[in-house]
Structure formats: C-alpha cells, structure tokens
Amino acid sequence: MYLQRWLFSTNAKDIAILYFIFSTFCGLAGTAMSFIIRMELSAPGQQYLQGQNQLFNVLVTGHTILMVFFLVMPMLIGGFGNYYLPLMIGASDMSFARLNNISFWTLPPTLICLLTSTMVESGTGTGWTVYPPLSSIQSHSGASVDLAIFSLHLTTISSLLGTINFIVTALNMRTNGMTLHKMPLFTWSILITAVMLLMSLPVLSAGVTMLLMDRNFNTSFFEVQGGGDPILYQHLFWFFGHPEVYIMIVPTFGMMSHIVSTYSKKPVFGEISMIYTMGSISLLGFLVWSHHMYVVGLDTDTRAYFTSATMIITIPTSIKVFSWLTTIYGGSLRLTTPMLYTLSFLFLFTVGGLTGVVLANTSLDVAFHDTYYVVTHFHYVLSLGAVFSMFAGYYYWSPTVLGLNYNEKLSQIQFWLIFLGTNIIFFPMHFLGINGMPRRIPDYPDTFTGWNLVSSFGSMMTIMSLMLFTYIIYDQLMNGLTNKVNNKSINYMKTPDFIESNNIFLMNTTKSSSIEFMLNSPPTIHSFNTPTIQS
C-alpha cells in the first residue's frame, strides 16, 4: 500500500511532495557541481581538475541544467504549484490527476539521461545553450550530447503535461463566486507561467530536434557546409531561453505577494495591477530574445529594437517591486524567517535587475558579453531571487504541509549564513566581469586571484548554510511542535485579520489572505469535498 500510494498516486499533494523531494536531491547535486567549479577557480592555474578543461565545461553544463530544469521548475511549479493551486481556488484536486502523475514520473528518467550524458565519452561540455558547432558531431562525437538532448526532450514533455493540467485547473475548477479577478496572486502566477511554458517549450524542442538530426541523420539545419546556419539555432534557443527566465521568476512573484501581505498584515497594494504586470512581463519576455545575441552580427536597427524592448520590461517589474514596498509601508511588520527571505529577495532581485538594465544596452553588452558580469547578473536574479523565494516558500508553507513547526532561531541563522554566503560569491563577480574575466574558462590571469578567492570562500559559507538547512528539516520532522489541540488545527498562521476577525484560540496569530491556512494542517487528501463559496 505504501509503495502504491507514492508510485501510483493521483493525489496532487502527494505528487507535490514527490516533486519537492526530487528537486531537492537535484538541487544538492547541482550545488555540488557549482562547489567544484568554485574550488577550481579559487586560485589561478590547475587546481582540483588537473587541467581537464572539458570536465570543467561538463560541470558547468550539468550545474546549469540541473538547477534550471530539475530544481527551480519542478519545485516552484510542480511542488508549490501542485500543492497550493487546488487549495487556493477551492478545488478538491488537479483537473487531470493521472496526467499529473505521469508528468512527475517522466522526470527521473530525464535525470538519468542527463547524468549519463556527463559520463559517456568526454561528457557534454557545451554549456546549457548547446550551441552548434560546439555541440555538432565534429566537436562532440560521442553519444553524450544526444543523451543531453533526450533529457531536454523528456523534461519538455513533463513540463507540457503539467502545463495543460495547471491551465485547465485554474480556468475550470475555481470555486463558486471566484472570478479571475478574485483568484489569489500565486494561482495567477502559476497560470501565467503555464501559458509561457506552452508557448516556448515547442520552440526549444524544434531546435534540439534539428540538432539531433544534424548530428545523426546528416541534415544541415545548422551545418554551414550544407547551407545551414548556426545562428538559426541561437534564435530558436533564446526564443525559449528568455521566457524560461521569466518562467522561473514569475511563480516567485506570486509567492512574494502572499508572504509580504501575511507578515505586513495588509492586503497586497494594487492586486489587480499585480496580475496585469505579471501578464505584461510574460508577454514582453517573448519579444526580447535577441538581447542574448548582440555579438552574433545583428544589424544596428535590430539591436536598437531589442535594447529598447528589454528596457521596457523594467517598467512592469518596477511596478511590482514598488507595490510590495507599498504593502510593507505602514504595515504591522513581523521579521520572521519567510519575511527575511522575502525582503532580501526584493533587494537582491532589484540589484540583479539593475545589472540587467546595463546589459540591455548593446554597446555595453558587446564589452560584457560572456564575462562574469553576465554570470553575476543572472545569478542575482535566479540564485538570489528564485532560490531565496523557494526557501521563503518552504518556511512559510511547510507548517501547513507537515503540521509541524520548524526551529525559528536556527532558521534565522541559516538565512543570514546563506544571505552572506551568496552575496560573497556573486558580488565580487561584478568586478571580475567589468575587468573582462571570461565565463566557462577554468583558468585566469593572476590579476583576478583576489576576488575569485573571496567568491570561493562565499561558496563554502553557502554549503554550510545548506547543511544547516538539512538539519532544520530533520529537526522539524523529528522534534517539530504540532499545531493541534484536541485533534483540531490551531495553526498559528490562521485567517486574514483584514478580512475577518476569527481568532478563536486567542493566540498571537499571523494572518493570511488565502484559503489554505483555514484548513487542517496537514490538509486532508481531498480538502474540499463540499464546494466552498467565494464571497
């Protein structure tokens, strides 16, 4: 029965927990790869990889694909999305329960393909972009790139199946009276993300399928000798790749809105505008892909358009940031662990956005392209944006998932460790990038030694914070205080005080604006056997 529950589950909550476990494992593997990269770069010359430069690039590729496709997307969309989207709209489960199951179980074979690709021949040393001609049969002759492409195909299938499920559930299974404008912001963020996935993933599939054909069936889509063009691949990849960045960050916008609202004890400022800004960010995300390609020989008019369009994205993003700040302003602020992560997300996401504005300029990007300035830009947005919001989401919602509370003191120590560690890693990279240190190269001139050493020290701090985080989870599961009295949930995060005053147990409650905190914790398998009604 136990195996049957987890292998054949059609319950969204169980599948979400499987996603959490799987993505945590992949995240730790990706972190281990990044740690090896940072140790190799801690000093000039050969360090730990003993001059195996191909292995360095294999680690870079593995780290990126693991973090993007196996940590951020499965956790934010598959984990938090599966668990909380049905709860927030008053649905008993996802619309297609069996589809949900297969969309998860497509992922483990995908991971096996990816990890195998690193061990076949000399591994996939192409970076996550898999650009030809580096990824073509002349440069990577073995089966490694083919396995990586199969891995991308399978993860695309998994994401598309989940996407269909989320869209249908959000549009068709809302409770009575819940119009789209009354739908919670996190649900909106998952819906918008799902639409973006549906639009962008087929383009990636087309690109890597053509690459597979070039490698194995002698076609010439990207082979110059046969009349093909490798730049076409870059256009196809980045038409997926740029929306992908927003696919990773938009769910975090929804989570941040909930957490800011809860710990400020105020409704989110401008809730409708928050929905429209998410929509406009996702739409604009499809119109700016060539800003990744300023140095491939685009003409001046094209580059002028992409510079302007990229800068326009900062407008809806700024509206979101200032709306969060306005929500906090004048609120009854409680600096719990989730709120600390959220505040640091606001600050660090803004820093990452500002470096993005710099890179949007063609003239500057020509200088900064493929340097560590680009690396630190997207890590500030993703590593210190998306990942911090995952921690925030865990600390915010795990008491409702497990029915057990975590150790607040330890979790705040863990926050400060990872906050300092990640900033010590990535802030010095601005200076390295401005001075022209190139990406994906395992060696560098002596002049870059100082900041690289600082950066590698930050990596050690981050590893320590993750060790502490695993202990916090262990402590929560073993010793966490339950939120129940006489078998009734008295979860200290109860109903929203700006909607109603329902403080039955006279506790110092934290308020939330959505329905998931009004249920038992952990919630029952079908939380709403009787349909709820939205007032």
Curated annotation (Swiss-Prot):
* Classification via SUPFAM superfamilies: Cytochrome c oxidase subunit I-like (SSF81442)
Annotated localization: Mitochondrion inner membrane
Q: Cofactor note, please?
A: Binds 2 heme A groups non-covalently per subunit.
UniProt catalytic activity = 4 Fe(II)-[cytochrome c] + O2 + 8 H(+)(in) = 4 Fe(III)-[cytochrome c] + 2 H2O + 4 H(+)(out)
What GO terms are given for molecular function?
Answer: cytochrome-c oxidase activity; heme binding; metal ion binding
Primary localization class, coarse: mitochondrion
In UniProt terms, what function does this protein have?
Answer: Component of the cytochrome c oxidase, the last enzyme in the mitochondrial electron transport chain which drives oxidative phosphorylation. The respiratory chain contains 3 multisubunit complexes succinate dehydrogenase (complex II, CII), ubiquinol-cytochrome c oxidoreductase (cytochrome b-c1 complex, complex III, CIII) and cytochrome c oxidase (complex IV, CIV), that cooperate to transfer electrons derived from NADH and succinate to molecular oxygen, creating an electrochemical gradient over the inner membrane that drives transmembrane transport and the ATP synthase.
Q: What is this protein called?
A: Cytochrome c oxidase subunit 1
Report the source organism: Eremothecium gossypii (strain ATCC 10895 / CBS 109.51 / FGSC 9923 / NRRL Y-1056) (Yeast)
Which lineage? Eukaryota, Fungi, Dikarya, Ascomycota, Saccharomycotina
* Gene this protein is translated from: COX1
